[in-house]
């Protein structure tokens, strides 16, 4: 919300500067985002009156003006503005003045005629975008006065970021009420008075939807001057609040909205037919709004209508057919209370965001309407003349919201604030907040004022007491805690270390919902029975996840839909598995990879990621555990490709899964490239085996390569385990460096090349000893797997 500091200080003027005022509001919970100057920096501009305006002899569009500046001889000014005329009061930039830009005004000669200054438009002063003519000032403006002083331009615009619960502060009066409260100053709201009725013309109002609109006030105002102009002081206040002037009728309604927080609307009376109805729209009914957009209404939308048509989207925006214009002389002024629950969301449905809907959605004081319509009437009559008819009020008192009393306990204040306030100070704060207070022994019964929609609980009252007392005034009490250093076990692998490793390998951490859709859960494991939520947020978040893959797949889909086709993500969190009738929470690490193995670059050609790329990432994670008993065993998982999936084992226990997403699920979810996933039990992962020291051998390594023909479906891991077991302590490492099937290898077989590295810690290995070990290895592989040396 934007408002003028000078306007605010007309209601309440504390003895603090702008910085102090900003701090007061922020500490009271009304965060001020900034305080900017109300006008651009300029100097040397005064209020001047044009005494004479004669055509320039050498230019059709120029006039030679004699201008009174309030002292000395009138100045000769050459001006090209279309509205320059004798008697007009306008800003004059004197010789030597500096305008925004910066532009320094000098004596000049225009088409042979000297000009001793420049008459200014609003745009040239940086006040408005209108450059069509001179800025017209009231005829009684003091000639010779500095324009900055006259228009109060040495002002600041406060930008206040209000939380949704503080609808009572969506007005200058509301902010002024808070400033008075903070500074213990007296405060009186705007005294609207009662406008004298000069006409008996009125319209009958029917509340056809009283639950949505329990109070509606209307007034006919006739005979307003269609040529009247909004006064400069009102235009300036509107401008500083971010609104532009649209004519007296609209400007007055906008002004009262800013001043009191009550939206109003003015209809062109001549465009209305018969009585006014506040009703639900008819399905398919059309309404062209003030912004020119035609919308199709539905029956859950509230409209203001006459006997023939919908006139306005209630509480949101008026219609084009009944809008006031430049020729309007009779208006029907509307001021109503609309129930927040029935207005909420309707503006967003039609892509609208208006000042009215912003206030009605959050709640408008249901007792404000009479004062607001009297204030608007008085301002409109003052500016444009006319006669006001009687106020027509349609109301259902039983449907108006009432503020329920709230019990406040003295003991509870101390518990929540950590501060024991005297009872009389608590009562004083509540009274200053405008609340009705009845005191009893354990505390108070407090009734909030009608404008405080956000006060419903005891905690709400205590929050108000805390912020008015001052959060910064509450004494600090640091707890006396004795800290003791505790040894950290080296056998525990920290989860942060695992996250760092994955980040180093190009993964990004994500956090997804623990609740997922039942349909997605069935895809991952159709046999599992996920725990259903009794009151889910939505149908897509109806069950508790049995795997972190559900959230990762959803995240990958969202990334792909935003043209992010290389995804490497991981998540740590709980999954919920039902076992033996009870629900278990298991801490889990899961990851998902798709797209190219490398980011696009010139130095190396990239390729699609494959199973073994992701397997190497999992091996790197498991390598942090120091466990030597890690194995990958081909196995079937409902969510994984039957030919590219493996169960991860540590010892004889299952520790997780790795594989490519099942092709059927891939198609159902719309993935157009392979998706690889892994999931690890964090409990098994985070127990680490400490490394044991062994002296380094100073004798040379010996490597022998084996090319073996084995069954095509034999896992290479089985061969590696057999080599390690049969080779004995001399075998230091075995590496798989080639797999081949095709010409030269019989059908159903494959050729596997192994590099076996041997070393003795005591002496240099001889060929005989190496041959003996290799023969033993080959014999074991032949016996266990039918392996043959490839010729």
UniProtKB/Swiss-Prot annotation:
It is an enzyme of class 6 (ligase). Tetramer of two alpha and two beta subunits. Binds 2 magnesium ions per tetramer. It is found in: Cytoplasm. Its EC number is 6.1.1.20. Residues 401-476 form the B5 domain. GO terms for molecular function: ATP binding; magnesium ion binding; phenylalanine-tRNA ligase activity; tRNA binding. This is Phenylalanine--tRNA ligase beta subunit.
């Amino acid at each position: 919300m934007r408002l003028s500091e000078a306007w605010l200080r007309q209601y309440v003027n504390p003895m603090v500067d702008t910085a102090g005022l900003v701090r007061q509001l922020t500490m009271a919970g009304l965060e001020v985002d900034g305080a900017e100057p109300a006008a651009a920096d300029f100097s040397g501009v005064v209020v001047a009156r044009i005494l004479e305006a004669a055509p320039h002899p050498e230019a059709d569009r120029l006039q030679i003006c004699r201008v009174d500046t309030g002292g000395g001889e009138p100045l000769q000014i050459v001006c090209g503005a279309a509205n320059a005329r004798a008697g007009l009061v306008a800003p004059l930039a004197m010789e030597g003045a500096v305008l925004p830009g910066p532009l320094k005004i000098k004596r000049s000669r225009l088409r042979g005629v000297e000009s001793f200054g420049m008459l200014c438009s609003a745009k040239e002063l940086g006040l408005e975008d209108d450059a069509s003519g001179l800025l017209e000032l009231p005829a009684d403006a003091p000639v010779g006065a500095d324009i900055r002083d006259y228009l109060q331009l040495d002002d600041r615009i406060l930008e206040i970021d209000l939380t949704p619960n503080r609808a009572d502060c969506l007005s200058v009066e509301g902010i002024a009420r808070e400033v008075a409260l903070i500074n213990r100053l007296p405060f009186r709201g705007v005294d609207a008075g009662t406008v004298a009725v000069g006409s008996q013309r009125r319209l009958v109002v029917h509340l056809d939807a009283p639950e949505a609109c329990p109070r509606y006030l209307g007034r006919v105002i006739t005979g307003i001057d269609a040529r009247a102009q909004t006064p400069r002081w009102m235009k300036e206040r509107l401008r500083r609040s971010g609104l532009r002037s649209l004519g007296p009728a609209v400007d007055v309604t906008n002004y009262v909205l800013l001043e009191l927080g009550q939206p109003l609307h003015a209809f062109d009376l001549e465009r209305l037919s018969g009585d006014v109805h506040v009703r639900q729209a008819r399905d398919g009914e059309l309404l062209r709004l003030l912004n020119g957009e035609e919308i199709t209404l539905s029956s859950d939308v509230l409209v203001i209508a006459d006997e023939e048509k919908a006139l306005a989207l209630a509480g949101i925006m008026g219609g084009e057919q009944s809008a006031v214009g430049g020729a309007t002389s009779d208006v029907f002024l509307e001021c109503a209370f609309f129930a927040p629950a029935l207005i909420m969301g309707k503006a967003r449905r039609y892509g609208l965001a208006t000042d009215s809907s912003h206030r009605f959605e959050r709640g408008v004081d249901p007792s404000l309407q009479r004062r607001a319509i009297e204030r608007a009437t008085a301002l409109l009559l003052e500016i444009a003349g006319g006669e006001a008819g009687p106020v027509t009020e349609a109301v259902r008192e039983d449907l108006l919201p009432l503020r329920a009393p709230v019990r406040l306990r003295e003991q509870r204040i101390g518990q929540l604030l950590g501060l024991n306030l005297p009872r009389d100070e608590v009562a004083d704060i509540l009274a200053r907040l405008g609340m009705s207070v009845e005191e009893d022994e354990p505390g108070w019964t407090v009734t909030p004022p009608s404008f405080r929609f956000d006060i419903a609980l005891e905690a709400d009252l205590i929050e108000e007491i805390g912020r008015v007392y001052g959060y910064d005034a509450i004494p600090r009490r640091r707890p006396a805690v004795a800290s003791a250093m505790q040894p950290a076990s080296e056998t525990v692998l920290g989860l942060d270390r695992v996250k760092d490793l994955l980040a180093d390998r190009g993964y990004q951490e994500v956090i997804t919902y623990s609740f997922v859709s039942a349909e997605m859960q069935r895809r991952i494991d159709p046999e599992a029975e996920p725990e259903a939520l009794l009151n889910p947020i939505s149908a897509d978040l109806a069950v508790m996840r049995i795997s972190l893959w559900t959230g990762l797949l959803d995240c990958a889909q969202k990334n792909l839909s935003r043209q992010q086709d290389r995804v490497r993500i991981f998540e740590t969190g709980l999954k919920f598995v039902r076992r033996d009738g009870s629900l278990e929470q298991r801490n889990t690490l899961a990851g998902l990879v798709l797209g190219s193995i490398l980011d696009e670059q010139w130095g190396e050609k990239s390729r699609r990621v494959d199973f073994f790329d992701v397997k190497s990432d999992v091996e790197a994670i498991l390598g942090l555990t120091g466990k030597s008993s890690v194995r990958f065993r081909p196995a079937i998982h409902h969510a994984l490709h039957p030919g590219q999936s493996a169960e991860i084992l540590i010892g004889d226990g299952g520790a997780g899964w790795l594989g490519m997403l099942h092709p059927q699920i891939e198609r159902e979810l719309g993935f157009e490239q392979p998706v690889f996933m892994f999931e690890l039990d964090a409990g098994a992962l985070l127990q680490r085996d400490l490394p044991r020291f062994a002296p380094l051998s100073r004798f040379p390594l010996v490597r022998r390569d084996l090319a073996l023909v084995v069954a095509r479906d034999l896992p290479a891991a089985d061969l590696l385990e057999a080599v390690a077991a049969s080779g004995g302590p001399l075998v230091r490492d075995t590496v798989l460096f080639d797999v081949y099937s095709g010409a030269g290898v019989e059908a159903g077989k494959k050729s596997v090349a192994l590099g076996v590295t041997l070393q003795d810690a005591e002496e240099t290995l001889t060929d005989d000893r190496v041959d003996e070990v290799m023969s033993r290895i080959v014999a074991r592989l032949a016996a266990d797997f039918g392996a043959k040396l490839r010729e």
